[in-house]
Protein backbone atom coordinates (compact mmCIF):
# COMPACT_ATOMS: atom_id res chain seq x y z
CA UNK A 1 0.00 0.00 0.00
CA UNK A 2 1.30 3.43 -0.91
CA UNK A 3 1.89 5.99 1.84
CA UNK A 4 -0.28 9.07 1.89
CA UNK A 5 1.79 12.06 0.87
CA UNK A 6 1.61 15.49 2.37
CA UNK A 7 0.78 18.59 0.36
CA UNK A 8 -1.94 19.57 -2.03
CA UNK A 9 -4.01 16.78 -3.51
CA UNK A 10 -3.59 16.30 -7.24
CA UNK A 11 -6.51 17.55 -9.32
CA UNK A 12 -8.27 15.32 -11.80
CA UNK A 13 -6.88 15.26 -15.30
CA UNK A 14 -9.35 14.76 -18.10
CA UNK A 15 -8.52 12.22 -20.82
CA UNK A 16 -10.55 11.42 -23.92
CA UNK A 17 -9.97 7.67 -23.81
CA UNK A 18 -7.91 5.06 -22.01
CA UNK A 19 -5.05 3.60 -24.09
CA UNK A 20 -5.87 0.55 -26.19
CA UNK A 21 -2.25 -0.68 -26.04
CA UNK A 22 -0.53 -0.42 -22.67
CA UNK A 23 3.00 -1.70 -23.29
CA UNK A 24 5.56 -1.22 -26.06
CA UNK A 25 8.65 -3.43 -26.12
CA UNK A 26 11.74 -2.95 -28.30
CA UNK A 27 12.43 -5.81 -30.69
CA UNK A 28 15.78 -7.58 -30.68
CA UNK A 29 16.13 -7.47 -26.89
CA UNK A 30 15.60 -10.51 -24.68
CA UNK A 31 12.34 -10.03 -22.69
CA UNK A 32 14.04 -10.80 -19.37
CA UNK A 33 16.71 -8.14 -20.06
CA UNK A 34 14.29 -5.30 -20.85
CA UNK A 35 13.98 -2.49 -18.32
CA UNK A 36 10.63 -0.72 -17.97
CA UNK A 37 9.67 2.92 -18.06
CA UNK A 38 6.27 3.54 -16.45
CA UNK A 39 4.27 6.33 -18.07
CA UNK A 40 0.97 7.64 -16.72
CA UNK A 41 -2.25 7.92 -18.73
CA UNK A 42 -2.26 11.71 -18.34
CA UNK A 43 1.30 11.95 -19.75
CA UNK A 44 0.17 9.98 -22.81
CA UNK A 45 -2.89 12.23 -23.17
CA UNK A 46 -0.70 15.37 -23.00
CA UNK A 47 1.58 13.97 -25.71
CA UNK A 48 -1.44 13.06 -27.85
CA UNK A 49 -2.90 16.55 -27.61
CA UNK A 50 0.35 18.49 -28.12
CA UNK A 51 2.39 16.25 -30.40
CA UNK A 52 -0.11 14.22 -32.42
CA UNK A 53 -3.03 16.66 -32.55
CA UNK A 54 -0.80 19.78 -32.65
CA UNK A 55 -2.79 21.79 -30.09
CA UNK A 56 -1.31 24.81 -28.36
CA UNK A 57 -0.48 24.13 -24.72
CA UNK A 58 -3.23 26.49 -23.50
CA UNK A 59 -5.89 24.72 -25.59
CA UNK A 60 -4.67 21.26 -24.60
CA UNK A 61 -4.60 22.30 -20.93
CA UNK A 62 -8.24 23.37 -21.17
CA UNK A 63 -9.19 19.96 -22.60
CA UNK A 64 -7.38 18.17 -19.77
CA UNK A 65 -8.88 20.59 -17.21
CA UNK A 66 -5.47 21.61 -15.80
CA UNK A 67 -3.52 24.88 -15.80
CA UNK A 68 -1.16 25.63 -18.68
CA UNK A 69 1.98 25.29 -16.48
CA UNK A 70 0.71 21.94 -15.15
CA UNK A 71 0.10 20.76 -18.70
CA UNK A 72 3.67 21.72 -19.57
CA UNK A 73 5.04 19.71 -16.64
CA UNK A 74 2.94 16.65 -17.55
CA UNK A 75 4.06 16.88 -21.19
CA UNK A 76 7.73 17.33 -20.26
CA UNK A 77 7.61 14.32 -17.94
CA UNK A 78 6.02 12.14 -20.63
CA UNK A 79 8.49 13.22 -23.31
CA UNK A 80 11.44 12.59 -20.98
CA UNK A 81 10.19 9.05 -20.28
CA UNK A 82 9.68 8.27 -23.98
CA UNK A 83 13.14 9.62 -24.85
CA UNK A 84 14.70 7.54 -22.05
CA UNK A 85 12.96 4.41 -23.33
CA UNK A 86 13.89 4.99 -26.98
CA UNK A 87 17.55 5.82 -26.29
CA UNK A 88 17.97 3.10 -23.64
CA UNK A 89 16.03 0.35 -25.43
CA UNK A 90 13.48 0.10 -22.60
CA UNK A 91 9.88 -1.07 -22.52
CA UNK A 92 7.22 1.65 -22.14
CA UNK A 93 4.20 0.67 -20.02
CA UNK A 94 1.24 3.01 -19.55
CA UNK A 95 -0.63 2.82 -16.27
CA UNK A 96 -2.00 5.03 -13.53
CA UNK A 97 -2.24 8.75 -12.98
CA UNK A 98 -5.01 10.86 -11.49
CA UNK A 99 -7.52 10.95 -14.33
CA UNK A 100 -11.19 11.10 -15.19
CA UNK A 101 -11.52 8.16 -17.57
CA UNK A 102 -13.63 9.73 -20.31
CA UNK A 103 -14.31 13.47 -20.27
CA UNK A 104 -17.43 13.44 -22.41
CA UNK A 105 -19.25 11.24 -19.91
CA UNK A 106 -18.48 13.44 -16.89
CA UNK A 107 -21.47 15.26 -15.45
CA UNK A 108 -21.01 19.03 -15.20
CA UNK A 109 -21.88 19.06 -11.50
CA UNK A 110 -20.72 16.56 -8.92
CA UNK A 111 -23.22 15.24 -6.39
CA UNK A 112 -23.22 16.87 -2.96
CA UNK A 113 -22.06 13.66 -1.30
CA UNK A 114 -18.84 12.73 0.49
CA UNK A 115 -17.90 9.05 0.30
CA UNK A 116 -15.66 6.87 2.47
CA UNK A 117 -13.30 4.99 0.10
CA UNK A 118 -12.89 2.14 2.60
CA UNK A 119 -16.42 1.26 3.73
CA UNK A 120 -18.46 3.07 1.05
CA UNK A 121 -20.59 5.01 3.56
CA UNK A 122 -22.01 8.28 2.21
CA UNK A 123 -22.32 11.61 4.02
CA UNK A 124 -23.87 14.91 2.89
CA UNK A 125 -21.28 17.38 1.57
CA UNK A 126 -21.00 20.63 3.53
CA UNK A 127 -20.45 23.56 1.15
CA UNK A 128 -17.11 25.27 1.73
CA UNK A 129 -15.59 22.25 3.51
CA UNK A 130 -13.61 19.86 1.30
CA UNK A 131 -14.62 16.22 1.79
CA UNK A 132 -10.96 15.29 2.42
CA UNK A 133 -11.09 17.40 5.61
CA UNK A 134 -13.84 15.16 7.04
CA UNK A 135 -13.17 11.74 8.59
CA UNK A 136 -15.38 8.64 8.41
CA UNK A 137 -16.52 7.81 11.98
CA UNK A 138 -16.48 4.07 11.20
CA UNK A 139 -13.11 3.72 9.42
CA UNK A 140 -11.24 6.82 10.58
CA UNK A 141 -10.31 7.49 6.90
CA UNK A 142 -10.54 10.83 5.06
CA UNK A 143 -13.62 11.12 2.87
CA UNK A 144 -13.66 11.78 -0.88
CA UNK A 145 -16.14 13.64 -3.06
CA UNK A 146 -18.46 11.22 -4.85
CA UNK A 147 -17.96 11.42 -8.59
CA UNK A 148 -14.44 12.76 -8.19
CA UNK A 149 -11.36 11.70 -10.06
CA UNK A 150 -9.62 8.33 -10.04
CA UNK A 151 -6.18 8.00 -8.53
CA UNK A 152 -3.91 4.99 -9.03
CA UNK A 153 -5.43 2.94 -6.20
CA UNK A 154 -9.04 4.00 -6.72
CA UNK A 155 -9.02 3.40 -10.47
CA UNK A 156 -8.03 -0.27 -10.23
CA UNK A 157 -11.60 -1.48 -9.69
CA UNK A 158 -13.17 0.98 -12.14
CA UNK A 159 -10.54 0.31 -14.84
CA UNK A 160 -11.44 -3.37 -14.72
CA UNK A 161 -15.07 -2.46 -15.37
CA UNK A 162 -14.21 -0.21 -18.38
CA UNK A 163 -10.97 -1.55 -19.86
CA UNK A 164 -7.95 -3.05 -18.19
CA UNK A 165 -4.98 -0.67 -18.18
CA UNK A 166 -1.88 -2.30 -16.82
CA UNK A 167 0.83 -4.78 -17.51
CA UNK A 168 0.37 -7.45 -20.16
CA UNK A 169 -0.55 -10.99 -19.18
CA UNK A 170 1.73 -12.76 -21.68
CA UNK A 171 4.77 -12.21 -23.88
CA UNK A 172 2.56 -12.17 -26.99
CA UNK A 173 0.94 -8.97 -25.72
CA UNK A 174 4.38 -7.37 -25.39
CA UNK A 175 5.37 -7.77 -29.03
CA UNK A 176 4.76 -4.63 -31.08
CA UNK A 177 5.92 -4.82 -34.72
Swiss-Prot record:
Stored Pfam families: DUF134 (PF02001)
InterPro entries reported for this sequence: UPF0251
Region described as Disordered: 147-177
Family: Belongs to the UPF0251 family.
PANTHER family: PTHR37478, UPF0251 PROTEIN TK0562
Protein name (record): UPF0251 protein Cag_0886
Organism (species): Chlorobium chlorochromatii (strain CaD3)
Amino acid sequence: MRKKRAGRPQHCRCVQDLPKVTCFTPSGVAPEAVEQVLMTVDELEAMRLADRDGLYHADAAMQMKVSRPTFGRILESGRRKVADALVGGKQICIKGGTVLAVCDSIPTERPDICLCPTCGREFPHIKGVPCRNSICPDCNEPLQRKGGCLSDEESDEQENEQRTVGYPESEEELEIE
